[in-house]
Structures are given as structure tokens and as C-alpha cells.
Amino acid sequence: MNNNNNNRGRFPPGIGAAGPGPDPNFQSRNPNPPQPQQYLQSRTPFPQQPQPQPPQYLQSQSDAQQYVQRGYPQQIQQQQQLQQQQQQQQQQQEQQWSRRAQLPGDPSYIDEVEKTVQSEAISDSNNEDWKATLKLPPRDNRYQTEDVTATKGNEFEDYFLKRDLLRGIYEKGFEKPSPIQEESIPIALTGSDILARAKNGTGKTGAFCIPTLEKIDPENNVIQAVILVPTRELALQTSQVCKELSKYLKIEVMVTTGGTSLRDDIMRLYQPVHLLVGTPGRILDLAKKGVCVLKDCAMLVMDEADKLLSVEFQPSIEELIQFLPESRQILMFSATFPVTVKSFKDRYLKKPYIINLMDQLTLMGVTQYYAFVEERQKVHCLNTLFSKLQINQSIIFCNSVNRVELLAKKITELGYSCFYIHAKMVQDHRNRVFHDFRNGACRNLVCTDLFTRGIDIQAVNVVINFDFPRTSESYLHRVGRSGRFGHLGLAVNLVTYEDRFKMYQTEQELGTEIKPIPSLIDKAIYCQ
């Protein structure tokens, strides 16, 4: 069989192996093939295209006209549509490659992002109205400060997150990324280490939970990420946020803390766990027993990192890191970073991306007052504040466990509802108090500094320092319990003669101003 016949078998009539063009051996089925036309010279620089001739089997002139009207323009239109689709695909590919060139980090993960983008781009055509099916919570119309509103205008969709994760984000009540989330999420998704410093109540939890959940593979039943927190209450709160954000994902979240049944935790770890949230001591204990296997854990998050790197926790964390793979990613978040953080960063973080959104340490939306009182006048002053202020919920801080219990008893005797919580309580009792106060079962909570770290209760608009804190760092975290996520709050400090020097020192170290309390406090500064 010769090449000409092979060409005729492989290619359509009139097209040879070298491309479009007449085949000299091709015999047309049309007995009257169209003759080459001589182009007439005209004013137009380009020759007119020859019109197609209708086949001989079309007998009438009307049939021939319909053939030309239907066939020829339709071919032109199909070619134009094909060219437009090719141009659009080329533009999308160029945009993706330009975006890819700007992203630092692991190229393999960027490939995964590109595949996710392409797959979701295909599904977008069929699911353009997916947001219409969301069960959104009531919109929070309270005033917000620039801490959370001064954003770059990004949307959560800009980070190419999983559709089911986006559903959880929006149904959680997140509308747009806060400044710390805008800075952290895209960097964390590239696999880089992060050292982030941001104010209390500006969305740090979402800044590390969202990229952590995005990078977890639900099909791989191993522990892929660990979130470390310094307190049991913060562990419960963080795990609850993770569960709410991932409710449409098949991600198993486990929380483990000291004070709970070790046997129950061991039994739970025999089931699939993708994300582990807990305190360092308990997780280290489980890892030493060989029950908590961390060899596939590629992500370690440290919330309230300054507290985690204190003398109390740092040895446990350094020992725990030895159970992680060498290619781990570490994310550190806090409002303050002492010297110990820098030494830890130099030893364990690999070229970390530094984020510092702390132009001012104290929150912009919290108004701070002080009242000079004698020790024996404090309870009477507190009673006056309760009667004068419009309190949604308040947290009252004392410096010792005994003073917490005594003050809670006094407040109850005055006729106000009150809970108290401190570190010496049984863990089940602490959990119940925390849960009930968060759900609004009581208006006032008396506690020690145990409750200063990361606890997020949106209804709290008043913080009262019954005892002035011993350090400026503790003051910062106490005040941060009000004015959450840019909302307005009020902090009142009951200051004795012995406390005045600590208050002045706190003002200097934090660069803030604590004003004397006026006779009448405008509700607009803490109730909007």
C-alpha cells in the first residue's frame, strides 16, 4: 500500500500529511468541481473569500440558498468561538503562571493549588449560586475599629480555599479577612514558617485555623497538624472553632488537655485524628507513650507563643518538636514577643516570614479608666460600677485564688449573678463554668490571670481589674478580653496607693493612657 493511499485513509479528503492543501491523487465525488477563481483587482487590499457551491443533489434554488445560509456562516461562527475559547484558556494559564511565580514556598504544594483552581473553575460554571444556600448567622452591625477594618480588600475566595471550607467560614460569621488573616493565610499556604504579632481580638485564631484546615488531607488518617495552647479553656475554644469551620469537611478534630481522663484520650487516638489541639504537657505525655504518632505531622501551630515559651512550657515544647518530621512547618502567633521567642525562632524556624501589626499594643476600641481607692473601699466601688454601667457581660480580675472566691461571694451577697473560675478548680467544673458563662447564663465572672489568654467571648464589653495586674503584659491581655474583633469595650482599674507606680510603668511600657474615671461614663464609648 503506497503512501498516497495511506494519507487518504488517515486524513479527510483534500488534506494530506503535510496539512491543508489539494491532493493530486484525490478524485472528488463532485462531477463538476469548482474552478479556481481569478481575483479582480479592487480598492480593497484583501481578496474576497470564495463562496461555497451547493452540492448537485440540491435541485431547487431555495434549497441551495438555505444550504449556504446555514452551513457557511455556521462554520465561521464555530471557528470564531473556538479561537475565543483558546484565547481565554491562554490568558487564564498566563495569569496562573504569573501568580505562581510570585508565590514563595514548596513548588509541589503550588501544583496542588493550581489543580484545585482548575477543578473549582470547572465547577463554578455549575455552582455560581452556591452562596445562596449558606445558613448565615445574623449580621453583627456593631461599630468596629481600624484594627480589623483597615484591610486590603481581599476576599476569602482569593486564597483558592476548598469550597466546603469556604462554606464553614461564611457560616461561622466571617465576612472578610481581617488584617492579620490577610497577611498570614497566603503565606501559611505556601509552607513557610511564620512569626506573627498582632493585637488581641483581631482574628489570630482564624489566621492559623483556616490554612491548617486547608492543608489537611481527610483521606490520610494520620495526625497532620498540632495546635498548642497554654490553657485548657483556650484549647476547648480553639478546637470548637476548628470544628465549626470544618463542619463540611471530613476532618477529625481532637482536643486533649491535662486534668481530663488519659485513658479516654488514648482510646480516642485509636480512631482517625487529623488535627490535634491541646496543651503541651498532655500531648508530650501521649507522644512518649507511643499513642500519639507525630511522624507525619507537617504543621505545628503555637498560639499565645510568648506564654508557651515561658519557663513552665518551653522544655516540653522543645522535647515535643523532636517527635515531628524535619520538614515541619511552624506558625507562631501572639500579641507580645519577649526575648525567649527570638532564641526559639533562631533555633527551630527556617527563614520565617515576620508579620508585625502592633503599631499600638493596646486595643483601639477599649477605653481605659482608673479610680484611686483604698483596699477596704473596693467592694463598695465595684457595687457603684455595677449600678452605673450598662454591662452586657463583665470579667473581674483578681491576683490570687483566695481573693477570687471571696469576691465572688461578696458580689453574690450584693444581689448580682456571678460565676468564678481559677486554676485550682476541678477541670470538669472549670469546663462547665466556662461553657455556661459563654452561653450567657451569668453576667459577671471573677477569675485570675488564667482567663487572660485568648478567651473570646463576644458579649464581654467591660473588664474590671479589682486587683491591678503585676506586669504590663498581664494588663494588656486582661484588657484584651473586651473589645473583641474591633468592637468597643471599657476597662476600669481599681488602683490603691501602692499600685500607682505599677500603673504609671504600664502606661510607659505600652505607650497608652489610662484616664481618671469621670462621674458619668458615656455609654456610646463601650456599648455600640
Swiss-Prot record:
It holds the Pfam family DEAD. Its main location: cytoplasm. Residues 365-525 form the Helicase C-terminal domain. Residues 1-15, 65-80 have a biased composition (Low complexity). A motif (Q motif) lies at residues 154-182. A motif (DEAD box) lies at residues 303-306. Residues 1-80 are annotated as: Disordered. The gene is RH6. It is found in: Cytoplasm, P-body. It comes from Arabidopsis thaliana (Mouse-ear cress). It comes from the Eukaryota. ATP-dependent RNA helicase involved in mRNA turnover, and more specifically in mRNA decapping. Keywords: ATP-binding, Cytoplasm, Helicase, Hydrolase, mRNA processing, mRNA transport, Nucleotide-binding, Phosphoprotein, RNA-binding, Translation regulation, Transport. It catalyses: ATP + H2O = ADP + phosphate + H(+). The Q motif is unique to and characteristic of the DEAD box family of RNA helicases and controls ATP binding and hydrolysis. One of its GO terms (cellular component) is P-body. This is DEAD-box ATP-dependent RNA helicase 6.
